Every structure is written in C-alpha cells, then in structure tokens.
C-alpha cells in the first residue's frame, strides 16, 4: 500500500509550436533553459505526432502530410510556489500558445536522501 501525502505540487504544461522562437532560438529550448536557471525540479519536452490547434489546421509527422510545425508540450512538476514563479517568467515569452496548471500528487521515486529533503522542504513550506 502506498501512502499519499499532499505536498502542494502542481503540474505545468506549456503548449506551443515547434517553429516558435525566442531571441533567435527554438522557444521550447529557451523555456527549458530558463526553467533550469530558476532551479525548477525538472522539465520534459514532448513533440506531438498529430494534432490541431485553435485554427483547426492539422499538424502531422506523417510523410504524406509532413508538417514543419508540430505541436510541442513542455511538462513540469514542482512545488506550487515554484510553478507560480515559472509561469510569471514564461508567460511573456509565449506569443501563441497555451499554459495550463493543475494540482498533482507526487508519489516520489528516488533515493531516501532525496525523499527526506523533499519532505522537509514541504513541511517547511506549510509553516
């Protein structure tokens, strides 16, 4: 049985296009680099193989329908206050996209030292 404790963690998702840019570099790279500089717990970039956005135009990795602007999703899970800071920094970088934030429960997988540090930080955060 797994014990679940609320650690005030949030999941941030950033939906952008593969061709979106920030200061001459791919936007997804600029965002991940900024998150890393901020000390965010981690970020993962997913490249969509098929989808559409608000303009209802299909984007596909299919050879017969090769799109040069596939959907990109950047996903981050961290403590609530870190996600809030990240959103405030990233929002001005996005000209055409979407940001979502939702509560999530972390069932931590890691070393005992990492888990203990995470728990201590979460307890201190509640005070």
UniProtKB/Swiss-Prot annotation:
Pfam families: DUF190. It comes from the Archaea. InterPro entries: N-reg_PII-like_a/b (IPR011322), N-reg_PII/ATP_PRibTrfase_C (IPR015867), UPF0166 (IPR003793). Belongs to the UPF0166 family. This is UPF0166 protein PYRAB06660. The lineage of its organism: Archaea, Methanobacteriati, Methanobacteriota, Thermococci, Thermococcales.
């Amino acid at each position: 049985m797994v014990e679940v404790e609320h650690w005030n963690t949030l999941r941030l998702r950033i939906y952008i296009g593969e061709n979106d840019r920030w200061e001459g570099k791919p936007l997804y790279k600029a965002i991940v680099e900024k998150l890393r500089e901020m000390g965010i717990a981690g970020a993962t970039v997913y490249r969509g193989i098929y989808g559409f956005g608000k303009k209802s135009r299909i984007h596909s990795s299919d050879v017969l329908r090769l799109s040069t602007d596939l959907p990109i999703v950047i996903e981050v899970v961290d403590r609530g206050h870190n996600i809030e800071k990240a959103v405030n920094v990233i929002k001005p970088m996005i000209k055409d996209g979407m940001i979502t934030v939702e509560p999530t429960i972390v069932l931590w997988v890691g070393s005992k030292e990492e888990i203990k540090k995470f728990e201590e930080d979460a307890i201190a955060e509640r005070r």
